[in-house]
């Protein structure tokens, strides 16, 4: 197999520095009332990798990615997290980077597991799910989405 060796300057397009990632909440400012937005999603999300061939719900990623794939870091204050929702065709994988989270699933969120730093859970398509920061500090959750990026449905 033939390989390539990018220059350090060329590799910079594949580096995402957390402090430089824009908060996606700014993308919906003025379009969705802040109170409603915070019920639907994490306090802020920062897109790391996203497809370059279409606009994603989180905006373009700093690092270009393949179709139907995104990496987002969700920032949640204690008690914060999105509402119960499902993705018909998308697998969502959560890894706790900071604080502690509860991941709930089921049509009413009747099942749950708590995860701590570096613990990971992958939720398959078609399962109602939500997450919330149950720690005392700001939480960071690494979220990998694999599948159609606009197939979300919120619980009634």
Where are these regions (language model features)?
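A generic fold-level signal
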Residues: 64-68, 88, 136
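A short beta-strand-loop-beta hairpin characteristic of the jelly-roll/cupin
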Residues: 81-84, 89-117, 127
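Ligand-binding pocket scaffold of soluble enzyme catalytic domains
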Residues: 80, 103-105, 110, 138-139, ...
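Conserved hydrophobic/aromatic beta-strand scaffold that supports enzyme active sites
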Residues: 71-75, 93, 112, 120-122, ...
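A short, N-terminal "cap"/entry segment at the start of jelly-roll beta-barrel domains
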Residues: 1-68
């Amino acid at each position: 197999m033939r390989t390539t060796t990018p220059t350090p300057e060329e590799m910079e397009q594949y580096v995402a520095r957390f402090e430089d990632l824009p908060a996606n909440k700014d993308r919906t400012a003025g379009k969705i009332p802040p109170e409603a937005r915070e019920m639907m999603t994490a306090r802020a999300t920062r897109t790391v990798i996203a497809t370059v061939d279409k606009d994603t719900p989180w905006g373009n990623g700093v690092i270009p990615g393949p179709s139907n794939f995104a990496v987002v870091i969700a920032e949640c204050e204690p008690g914060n997290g999105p509402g119960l929702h499902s993705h018909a065709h998308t697998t969502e994988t959560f890894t706790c980077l900071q604080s502690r989270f509860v991941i709930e699933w089921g049509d009413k969120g009747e099942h749950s597991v708590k995860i701590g730093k570096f613990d990971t859970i992958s939720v398959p398509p078609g399962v109602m799910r939500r997450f919330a920061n149950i720690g005392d500090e700001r939480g960071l959750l690494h979220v990998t989405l694999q599948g159609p990026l606009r197939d979300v449905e919120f619980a009634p």
